[in-house]
Amino acid sequence: MGDVIVLYAAPGMGHIVSMVELGKLIVHRYGPHKFSITILYTCGSVVDTTSIPAYIRRISHSHPSISFCQFPRVTNKITPNISGAAIMFDFIRQNDPHVRRALQEISKSAAVRAFVIDLFCTSALPIGKEFNIPTYYFHTSGAAVLAAFLYFPKIDEQTTDSFKDLRDTVFEFPGWKSPLKAIHMVEPVLDRNDPAYSDMIYFCSHLPKSNGIVVNTFEELEPPTILQAIAGGLCVPDGPTPPVYYVGPLIDEEKELSNDAAAAEEEDCLSWLDKQPRRSVLFLCFGSRGSFPAVQLKEIANGLEASGQRFLWVVKKPPVEEKTKQVHGVDDFDLEAVLPEGFLERTADRGMVVKSWAPQVVVLKKESVGGFVTHCGWNSVLEAVVAGVPMIAWPLYAEQQMNRNVLVTDMEMAIGVEQRDEEDGFVNAEEVERRVRELMESEGGRLLRERCKKMGEMALAALGETGSSTRNLVNFVSSIT
């Protein structure tokens, strides 16, 4: 079987796709004669969707040098009053015996050159070390969040209170231009009494114990102060910082539709975009899981209508619980029932609303698209960057508030919406209209668009033969051979 690199994906479609893209990058650069890729993934998580098996079959067929190892099903224990993050960390720990067994089996027929684990799979780090396999992290967000995670054990020492109670108290991270409000920390650390808090401390403190960290970003995108803070050891003041390899942007260009109805809707929205003037359409999409209650959807609709701008808006079914910002899967629903009465008719000449899904990578590359309202999930950010499209930053969950901070203040790639500093992060119609007009009509929006266009060119150059990301990939491979 030869040399193999084993990748271990955290639960969920997005994490699996990111690992596949890393595997494809390695195989594309070095060919299957150099390395084969085996991707380990779990079964039984609450975030599993029916699209995962079909996706894996498709990748297995189109990329024969990438194979998959699905673990036996583990029951995701749902415990009342425990956060989803804590439940997920526990689920990943329950899979540790399967990780050990998989590495044992693979090692019988191949030389495992590296074991690359998702950040959230930290419990597998000592297993890789146990087999004397160089073990690396794959960080699927940007350098700013990596800097924050590396430094978080020091932040933990600064207070004994929960960040959710500290609210507007600000904390400084090495290299960041502006501090972060306590309430905007990543969700798993907001409540010190939740088990997820200690899980996060554990994984942040173990990042430096790896052989290195592979990051889905590129050097030119990142603020130099943040790159210097990481490289200079400011984020890990009490010990050595492992090598960091910025190899992005890794983007899934092969997303496939789930059914014929989705295919027809895709064709309709792309055809509509082709008929619109250049850079005139605002695209609104909040990720595969981002969802709003009906009251927020109505505010967005009223803001869009008042702005007078053209728009393509992806609307997902509102969550059952009003405060929830995530949905899993794609359920059908009555679109007109969740929007203001008559909205679709009044905006039909300049707007299009689609249910649940649109081909985001393709949409962002359309000439007619001039702006993107995003939840600041890192994959979506990179897709916009590559397409050269400026953003309106509207974070919902996970590390997205951190991404928003850096996109707006440090990178100057986005305009931020003002959200109510409550759990729901509510945005009113007037703020929606204001930010839409600012991006699509103002001189500041035009300058932002020019900046984003240049960054898109840099993204492509980073992956070129002499680009920074190619150089970093070569350095990573050199470290394991």
From Swiss-Prot:
One of its GO terms (molecular function) is UDP-glucosyltransferase activity. Signal peptide: none annotated. Its EC number is 2.4.1.-. Pfam families: UDPGT. InterPro entries: UDP-glycosyltransf_plant, UDP_glucos_trans, UDP_glycos_trans_CS. UDP-alpha-D-glucose binds at residues 288, 357-358, 375-383, 397-400. Keywords: Glycosyltransferase, Transferase. CDD domains: GT1_Gtf-like. Glycosyltransferase that may possess chalcone and dihydrochalcone 2'-O-glucosyltransferase activity. Belongs to the UDP-glycosyltransferase family. This is UDP-glycosyltransferase 88F3.
